[in-house]
A protein has these predicted regions:
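Extended, charged coiled-coil "arm/hinge" scaffolds of SMC/Rad50-like chromosome-maintenance ATPases
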Residues: 497, 501-535
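Charged, surface-exposed helical/loop "interaction arms" that form contiguous linear patches used
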Residues: 359, 363, 373-376, 429-430, ...
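Charged catalytic and DNA/RNA-contacting regions of genome-maintenance
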Residues: 1-329, 345-358, 362-454, 581, ...
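C-terminal tails and terminal domains of large nucleic-acid-associated
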Residues: 838-877
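Conserved phosphate-binding elements of NTP-dependent enzyme cores
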Residues: 2, 10-14, 21, 534, ...
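Amphipathic heptad-repeat alpha-helical coiled-coil/stalk segments that mediate oligomerization
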Residues: 206-217, 265-266, 281, 372-447, ...
């Protein structure tokens, strides 16, 4: 039978029962201790020593701990790994309590509610997401608790997952919360598991009615205009969860807006990923992305906003032109741009600092950073007052100088305060008379103590006597054993050491009481003054947040201006005629990182008159994919208001950009490369509009040649007949170039090639016309395939080309000179024509059965050799 638990362990188990999903950091003196399974997890994840503690059980309870003053870094590590941490503090002074100190959880830290400076990536948002399902809709809410921003999105078609997946890809939440009763469909779970690592799904219960939940949101946010009741309910559930987790005021969460669809360019999951807008494909980092090129921001707020702009560009012409005008003004006024940027460089992340003011976790160094940030606001406003563009004048109007708060912080906070309030010396001398008096007493005490020591030495002749202090019995005099016989009678022995004796005196004890009392009073008064200062700042948090958002916009515009100036970008003309006309456009990312080459510029012309669909054929490695990605990236740049790398450009905004480039298996869902490709194409054909930009690269390559060709042609025809979106379609199926004869708005383009013998140079220029070969052997030679393989491939290629010519001649005779490589709208399928008899030959039957895409290169060459030998035996060459 187990022994009864100790009182402390009973208290721990009671609290732990209410926080079973969290790792409980249980405060014991100067440490946070973890027990049982929590200790096993923490010791493994933090690489700290696992010990045991007698708690009443027959066996020692597993335990580990971290110093409370260093706990923040340990907690951040656990949270980044996907754990939730509950902080259980001592709510009473152990010195003033007999028995067990009262303890309770003061806050819970989760991946989506981190507020500390080091716990969040300063240049990225950290979103918590709520999924709320009602009868006919999903409501998604995304909240960055550290900045106070809330975005909501109502999806009325519950079966259409694309809107949900696109929103999740844009905001990339670190935690998803689910009100009680919400059950995620399996395909949504699969998407979340596949796209996000260490994400936490947090179900939570509430005893409030739906009406009470909605009313809570209305009370908190005020008038947000007309919204569905279920949106208010979703916002209310978010607030209830945050209050339960943070356990403090959250009025700083006040910047609410809807995820705009009508006036935003929608970039779906695939486009964001394959265009490498904010994360690269290599390791998910920023290096080599469009964000990497454009991000010259100087403030964390600006960095976060630029990322949002890139992931959600504008479609409204007036808004785009307003941004362009601001960028243009900052480019032409170099002195003002440099001055503004030098001032922005002095600004800290006070958007998040005021969030910590609200929740009570603001540090003295945070307030110093806020003070230094506010100090430069008048100078920024002075520079902006000379600007003429609407965006810059609007920013100036939104920035307040917050003089009252700045003056308060300047007078109240020490120039170099301690890291924590407990260390003292946070409040500046001269701010509070009572505090000054107590500090004077504490400071002068050292002088008084030195004088007392000197007087004792003179009166007793004990020249080696010295004063000291420890926590056990306070101040003391220390005398060596050899001199202990000379101490006066009023000395009271308190401790015997190996080589000395320690004494106190009535006068020394009286001094100690006065000094320690002063120190305790200093700590208490500094804490009181600090809290009052925090309360004063809380009164203007909303205004300070608006200033931070205005500065973020200024920082982004300044960043775009600097990049545009340094890289010699031009301002594209924004038009509404449906045309994209870019002359000598360049890929901004590749151009930046090219070391030894000059990037070859290309024109991009798309319109609804005669060049709506560009069918691009040509060699691999020649630049087709770069050209298409370049078109999409330049559109994104133009639609955020940026200048672009080109000689000149006029651009009509597009509503969506779709990309299907690259191919890979989706192992997590058991889907092959071809299935993934077909699903992506189906999504594009279902969602693309007349105003969309469609990028399709090598559709149909994941299946047999005839299947792939048929699918590719059918996709081309569907877009040309039904969607009429501006399209760039790269393909290795050269047979498709004949479609130019059937569709007036389809034009063939290819990559210019210069041949000299067996040497081939890809000129990287996109020109009108179609390609009749892929130069695959040349690419293989560049890739380093053995010469023996290359020579064998050339022999096989020559043989296949001869057979192809024979078939083409027969085809011309049968069809009266018309090519049936591609089925034109008025021509029967090959299988329905006399030409179909060609494919009854056993060799051709065998060829049709070959799955080339599943073979290695060597296996493919061997198979070709076998078929060639079989053909020779049947009477071939």
């Amino acid at each position: 039978m187990a022994k009864k638990q100790t009182p402390m362990m009973e208290q721990y188990l009671d609290i732990k029962s209410r926080y079973s999903e969290e790792l409980l950091f249980f405060r014991l003196g100067d440490f946070y201790e973890l027990f049982n399974d929590d200790a096993l997890i923490a010791s493994r994840e933090l690489n700290i020593t696992l010990t045991g503690r007698p708690t009443g059980d027959e066996e020692r309870t597993p335990m580990c701990g971290v110093p409370f003053h260093a706990a923040e870094s340990y907690i951040e590590t656990l949270v980044k790994k996907g754990y939730k941490v509950a902080i259980c503090e001592q709510l009473e002074d152990p010195k003033a309590v007999k028995g067990i100190v009262k303890r309770d959880v003061i806050k819970v830290i989760t991946p989506g509610t981190v507020m500390t400076e080091n716990g969040n990536d300063a240049r990225s948002n950290n979103f918590l997401s709520l999924f709320y399902m009602v009868k006919d809709a999903w409501i998604l809410v995304f909240s960055d608790v550290s900045t106070g921003e809330v975005i909501w999105h109502r999806i009325t078609d519950c079966e259409k997952r694309s809107d949900m997946f696109d929103a999740l890809s844009m905001y990339r939440p670190s935690e998803i919360i689910l009100p009680e009763g919400t059950i995620l469909p399996q395909d949504i779970k699969d998407f979340i598991d596949n796209q996000f690592s260490n994400i936490v799904l947090s179900p939570f219960s509430t005893y409030h009615t739906q009406r009470e939940v909605a009313e809570k949101a209305v009370t908190h946010f005020g008038n947000l205009g007309l919204m569905e009741e279920d949106v208010w309910e979703a916002l209310g559930y978010m607030l209830l969860y945050l209050e339960d987790i943070i356990k403090s005021e959250i009025s700083h969460i006040n910047y609410v807006h809807q995820l705009s669809v009508g006036n935003r360019l929608i970039l779906d999951t695939s486009s964001l990923r394959h265009l490498e807008i904010t994360h690269n494909l290599r390791d998910g980092g920023q290096k080599g992305t469009l964000l990497d090129v454009l991000d010259r921001t100087l403030t964390p707020m600006g960095a976060r906003l630029l990322k949002q702009w890139l992931e959600s560009p504008l479609t409204d012409v007036n808004q785009i032109q307003r941004r362009q005008a601001a960028v243009a003004e900052l480019i032409t006024r170099g002195a003002e741009r440099s001055h503004i940027r030098s001032l922005l460089d002095c600004i800290y992340d006070f958007e998040r600092i005021v969030g910590r003011v609200e929740t009570g976790s603001v540090s003295p160094r945070d307030l110093t950073a806020l003070r230094e940030s506010l100090a430069v606001l008048p100078d920024i406003k002075n520079v902006l007052s000379t600007c003429a563009s609407l965006s810059l004048t609007s920013i100036n109007d939104r920035i307040q100088d917050h003089k009252d708060i700045y003056d308060l912080l300047r007078r109240a906070i020490a120039d170099q305060p301690a890291l924590t309030l407990k260390e003292g010396r946070v409040i500046k001398d001269g701010f509070n008379p009572d505090l000054d008096e107590l500090r004077s007493l504490a400071t002068n005490s050292e002088q008084w103590l030195a004088k007392m020591e000197a007087d004792i030495k003179e009166a007793t002749g004990l020249s080696k006597i010295k004063t000291g202090y420890n926590k056990v019995f306070g101040y003391y005099f220390e005398v060596s054993h050899s001199k202990s016989e000379q101490v006066p009678d009023y000395f009271i022995r308190k401790q015997t050491l190996a080589n000395a004796e320690r004494y106190i005196t009535p006068e020394l004890k009286e001094f100690e009481i006065k000094i320690l009392s002063a120190k305790d009073k200093i700590i208490a008064l500094e804490h009181e003054l600090y809290q009052q200062l925090r309360n004063d700042i809380k009164l203007v948090i909303k205004d300070v947040q608006e200033t931070a958002r205005a500065l973020a916009e200024l920082d982004v515009l300044g960043s775009l201006a600097l990049v545009g100036y340094e890289e010699h970008y031009i301002c594209p003309t924004i038009v509404m005629n449906g045309q994209i006309n870019i002359r000598d456009g360049r890929h901004p990312v590749i151009e930046k990182f090219l070391k030894r080459e000059v990037f070859v510029p290309n024109d991009i012309v798309l319109n609804h008159d005669d060049e709506e669909f560009l069918l691009i054929t040509g060699p691999n490695m020649a630049g087709k994919s770069t050209y298409m990605r370049q078109a999409a990236i330049l559109m994104i740049m133009a639609q955020i208001g940026s200048f672009i790398p080109a000689r000149e450009a006029s651009i009509s905004p597009v509503d969506r950009i779709f990309t299907r480039v690259g191919a890979s298996d989706d192992i997590s869902t058991g889907q092959s490369t071809f299935m993934v490709e077909m699903k992506a194409v189906a999504y594009i054909l279902e969602n693309a509009t007349h105003n969309s930009l469609i990028i399709l690269d090598e559709i149909g390559r994941g299946t047999s040649t005839f299947d792939g060709l048929s699918i590719a042609q059918a996709v081309v025809e569907h877009i040309c007949k039904h969607i009429h979106g501006k399209t760039l379609f790269a393909t290795h199926y050269h047979e498709l170039i004949c479609l130019e004869e059937s569709y007036s708005k389809l034009k063939n383009y290819t990559v210019a090639v210069k041949e000299k013998g067996k040497d081939v140079a890809f000129l990287r220029r996109i020109i009108k016309g179609g390609a009749d070969r892929s130069y695959g052997i040349h690419v293989a030679r560049v890739a380093g395939l053995p010469n023996s393989v290359l020579k064998r491939a050339e022999v096989i290629l020559e043989s296949l080309e001869d057979q192809s010519h024979d078939a083409s001649d027969l085809n011309n005779r049968v069809m009266g000179g018309q090519s049936t490589n591609v089925v034109k709208p008025a021509v029967k399928q090959v299988s329905d024509s006399p030409l179909g008899n060609l494919f009854t030959h056993s060799v051709l039957d065998s060829l049709l059965e070959v799955d080339v895409m599943s073979m290695t290169p060597i296996e493919a060459l061997n198979k070709l050799y076998e078929l060639q030998e079989e053909a020779r035996k049947g009477g071939g060459k």
